[in-house]
Curated annotation (Swiss-Prot):
It is found in: Cytoplasm. GO terms for biological process: peptide biosynthetic process. Its main location: cytoplasm. This is Elongation factor P. Pathway: Protein biosynthesis; polypeptide chain elongation. SUPFAM superfamilies: Nucleic acid-binding proteins, Translation proteins SH3-like domain. Involved in peptide bond synthesis. Stimulates efficient translation and peptide-bond synthesis on native or reconstituted 70S ribosomes in vitro. Probably functions indirectly by altering the affinity of the ribosome for aminoacyl-tRNA, thus increasing their reactivity as acceptors for peptidyl transferase. InterPro entries: Elong-fact-P_C, NA-bd_OB-fold, Rib_uL2_dom2, Transl_elong_fac_P/YeiP, Transl_elong_KOW-like, Transl_elong_P/YeiP_cen, Transl_elong_P/YeiP_CS, Transl_elongation_fac_P. GO terms for cellular component: cytoplasm. Belongs to the elongation factor P family. Keywords: Cytoplasm, Elongation factor, Protein biosynthesis. CDD domains: S1_EF-P_repeat_1, S1_EF-P_repeat_2.
Length: 187
């Protein structure tokens, strides 16, 4: 059990038979009446976001999530197959369960698979990944690092804005949390 006073961004709770993650929270102490906690919760399974208010100090069941580092081995139809490299046990996740993470997911990549009650819920990618540029406008002599940006499509199909001097075939580091270019990768 966790008190609503202990909510922090990222805290997970069980509510109505589902797992919810606290996205935002605000402790409110009005002049009259008792204090309360206004939250914005995101359903881990479906991605729905709701606003909910709890009394200050209200006790709620905390969802204990388990993380396992698995390797994405291959796709089978619409399912992504992950393998625990220690036990060689396979776990399958649907495209819906993976969500936006799939735009940076490539075969051979190690990720954290988050489970609740032995059911896989979502995939947590590393904060940054190295991917190759597959499609972009060609770089032109004179384009500088301080100039503008252009769209580039990466090997996984993700699109990010990159500096003008980059060209097809170069490997770049991308922040998976906010889809931004971090720099060239020397390989």
């Amino acid at each position: 059990m966790i008190s609503s006073n202990d909510f922090r961004t990222g805290t997970t709770i069980e509510l109505d038979g589902a797992v919810w993650r606290v996205v935002e929270f605000l402790h409110v102490k009005p002049g009259k009446g008792s204090a309360f906690v206004r939250t914005k919760l995101k359903a881990v399974q479906s991605g729905n976001v709701v606003e909910k208010t709890f009394r200050a100090g209200e006790m709620l069941p905390q969802a204990i999530l388990e993380k396992a580092t698995l390797q994405h081995t291959y796709m089978e139809g619409e399912d992504y197959v992950f393998m625990d490299m220690g036990t060689y046990e396979e776990t399958r996740l649907s495209a819906k369960q993976i969500g936006e993470s799939r735009k940076y997911l490539k075969e051979g990549m190690e990720v954290n698979v988050v489970s609740w009650n032995d059911k896989p819920l979502e995939v947590e990618l590393p904060n940054s990944v190295v991917l190759e540029i597959k499609e972009t406008d060609p770089g032109v002599k004179g384009d500088t690092a301080t100039g503008g940006t252009k769209p580039a499509i990466l090997e996984t199909g993700a699109q990010v804005m990159v500096p003008l001097f980059l060209s097809i075939g170069e490997k770049i580091k991308v922040d998976t949390r906010n889809d931004t270019y971090l720099g060239r990768e020397n390989s």
